[in-house]
């Protein structure tokens, strides 16, 4: 039976959900395929959303019109802001989320979205035809399911997660499976290979889930969450959090006994017995890998985190392993407070197929296959937030292409999402890629609190940001501008300022000062000058945060914006997709070959490709007549 839609999304994990919602909300007929309707937006690893740089991604997804932030807000068990000891640019929100409630909410959102159908079926084949449309050699025209259905489509987005030829490892036992023991996707990898797509093999893992009532929490350190915090999403009413109880997490440490057990049995780990060939995540190593890489450390910190309000399962962050079940019990019970612990789900490692992301444009469309997109762990990343961010962009661009409109390409200077995609498509990755604030050279500009200012207008132009969201954004923007002006123009006399400063252990004022001048001082913030601000208006917390932070870091931001402007002309200069690099005189052979293979869309992307140096860029600019 042949069926028809405009956009097909393969896989309903965090990438697939955002891709399908973006496409459908932009008015495009969309079908989302999943191997199990019960595993939509699953969190097979840590039950949390956000973290260092990841929190920034969630705010950016929300600013563009995505869904992750709102759903995370509604199921928050605990919220914390990381990196508070550092500058505001790297403050990152992280929430413990109720895993099952998150899935239920996301499934409900999908079911209620117009232009979107959900179907439980496995996609086993991508159907393509040859095309004369440069620079593509093929065009996607449909997909086939394991049930024999053919769905014709204009675009398809692959969000396969860790399901493609997935294989689980526990000690010397291994078997084909997706995460959580779900079925793996067997046929799709062969179809991708047949279409000339290069695949890689990556690995990740997850710790055991332990029964809460068998842990002696009196022996663990308690980690409380924040009582006063801002939501991820513009949609979330702050009243939702007023009567919620913060569920605590706990901290425990490995010890010498734990380490001896692991060392004595490390030969039984699938990682070290030669069974696993895939590359694992550098920034989320297994416990046995930690002992090998950090042999001098006497202990490792572990976090004991709730999986949900209505389950006994506790997640032991930092304790992932592929050791056999008997060793898992032995090392777990060596921990303080875990002497009688019972495992509900065993830890495992999982190996899976993914692509070399340099095969993609910054739109996340395959360079050789028109209308075929990739997103999420399928593109070589790790993490729910990285996946959701890519899914959103792939969904937007698939919808825009279907409607004959220009794609959305986010710059490094305007978003972490742009940085993530630029890194993947120009540099590639040889290990699961994780977003970090240090990956952005423009991080002073990319705060969590100004994500809407940076990206909501882009989402609006693309047709994803709703009227309600845009109206709320404009109102907030106006409030911020008014408050900044008020702080800049409200002056405190020299006498009052001196009295205030001396009481705070500071030198006396040399003249009258504005409230903004005081905020710019390193020792003061908005709350600390309240006694001088007698006519302070009652404003929302998010308005206060952005207004005061803008003022405090204005000097640094101005310098970084000047740097962005300096490189903007060359950075965004487009490169013809059919440019013949191999015949550009003066271009080194290595550079020409790399450029010909990766086909960058802009001069900025070309400059970041490994093997392309500044002299090569100069040759390219002269050839294009830019210099």
How would you name each of these model-derived features?
Residues 3-15:
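Beta1/beta-strand and adjacent pyrophosphate-binding region of the FAD-binding site
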Residues 10, 150-161:
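Short hydrophobic core segments
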Residues 127-150:
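Conserved beta-strand-loop-beta-strand element in the redox core of flavoprotein oxidoreductases
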Residues 439, 456-618, 622-627:
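Extended, charge-enriched "interface" segments that sit outside catalytic cores
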Residues 3-5, 146-155:
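Core beta-strand elements of the Rossmann-like FAD/NAD(P) dinucleotide-binding domain
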Residues 36-38, 190-329, 426-509, 517-522:
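An anion/pyrophosphate-binding glycine-rich loop and adjacent beta-alpha core
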Residues 315-381, 409-422, 537-594, 599:
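A glycine-rich dinucleotide-binding beta-alpha-beta segment and adjacent secondary-structure elements
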Residues 21-125, 147, 159-176, 183, ...:
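Conserved N-terminal/central alpha/beta ligand/cofactor-binding core
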């Amino acid at each position: 039976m042949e069926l028809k839609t405009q956009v097909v999304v393969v896989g309903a994990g965090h990438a697939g959900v955002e891709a399908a919602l973006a496409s459908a909300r932009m008015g495009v007929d969309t079908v989302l395929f999943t191997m199990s309707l019960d595993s939509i937006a699953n969190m097979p690893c840590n039950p949390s959303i956000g973290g260092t740089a990841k929190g920034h991604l969630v705010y950016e997804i929300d600013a563009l019109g995505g869904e992750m932030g709102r759903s995370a807000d509604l199921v928050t068990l605990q919220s914390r802001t990381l990196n508070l000891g550092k500058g505001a640019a790297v403050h990152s929100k992280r929430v413990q989320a109720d895993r099952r409630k998150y899935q239920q909410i996301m499934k409900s959102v999908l079911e209620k979205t117009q232009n979107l159908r959900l179907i439980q079926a496995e996609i086993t084949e991508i159907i393509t035809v040859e095309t004369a449309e440069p620079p593509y050699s093929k065009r996607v025209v449909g997909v086939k399911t394991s049930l024999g259905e053919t769905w014709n489509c204009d675009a398809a987005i692959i969000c396969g997660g860790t399901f493609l030829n997935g294989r689980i490892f526990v000690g010397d036992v291994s078997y084909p499976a997706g995460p959580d023991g779900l079925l793996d996707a067997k046929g799709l990898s062969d179809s991708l290979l047949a279409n000339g797509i290069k695949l890689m093999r990556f690995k990740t893992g997850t710790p055991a889930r332990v029964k809460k009532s068998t842990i002696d929490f009196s022996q663990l350190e308690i980690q409380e969450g924040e009582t006063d915090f801002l939501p991820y999403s513009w949609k979330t009413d702050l009243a939702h959090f007023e009567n919620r109880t913060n569920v605590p997490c706990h901290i425990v440490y490995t010890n010498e006994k734990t380490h001896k057990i692991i060392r004595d049995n490390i030969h039984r780990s699938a990682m070290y017995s030669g069974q696993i060939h895939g590359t694992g995540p550098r920034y989320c190593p297994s416990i046995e890998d930690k002992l090998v890489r950090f042999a001098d450390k006497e202990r490792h910190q572990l976090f004991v985190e709730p999986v949900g309000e209505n389950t006994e399962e506790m997640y032991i962050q930092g304790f992932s392993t592929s050791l056999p079940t008997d060793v898992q019990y032995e090392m777990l019970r060596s921990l303080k407070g875990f002497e009688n612990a019972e495992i509900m789900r065993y830890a495992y490692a999982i190996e899976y197929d993914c692509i070399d992301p340099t095969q993609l444009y910054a739109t996340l469309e395959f360079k050789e296959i028109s209308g075929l997109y990739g997103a999420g762990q399928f593109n070589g990343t790790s993490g729910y937030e990285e996946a959701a961010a890519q899914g959103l962009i792939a969904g937007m661009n698939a919808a825009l292409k279907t409607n004959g409109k220009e794609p959305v390409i986010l710059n490094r200077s305007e978003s972490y999402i742009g940085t993530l995609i630029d890194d993947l498509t120009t540099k590639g990755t040889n290990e699961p890629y994780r977003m970090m604030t240090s990956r952005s050279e423009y991080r002073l500009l990319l705060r969590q609190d100004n994500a809407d200012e940076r990206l909501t207008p882009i989402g609006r132009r693309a047709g994803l940001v709703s009227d309600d969201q845009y109206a709320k954004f404009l109102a907030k923007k106006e409030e911020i501008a008014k408050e900044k002006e008020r702080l800049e123009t409200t002056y405190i006399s020299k006498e009052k300022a001196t009295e205030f400063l001396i009481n705070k252990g500071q030198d006396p004022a040399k003249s009258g000062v504005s409230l903004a001048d005081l905020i710019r001082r390193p020792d003061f913030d908005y709350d600390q000058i309240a006694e001088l601000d007698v006519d302070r208006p009652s404003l929302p917390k998010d308005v206060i945060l952005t207004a005061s932070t803008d003022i405090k870091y204005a000097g640094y931001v101005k310098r970084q914006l000047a740097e962005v402007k300096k490189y903007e002309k060359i950075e965004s200069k487009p490169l013809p997709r059919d440019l013949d690099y191999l015949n550009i005189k003066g271009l080194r052979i290595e550079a020409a070959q790399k450029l010909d293979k990766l086909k960058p869309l802009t001069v900025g992307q070309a400059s970041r490709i490994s093997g392309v140096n500044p002299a090569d860029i100069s040759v390219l600019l002269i050839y294009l007549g830019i210099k």
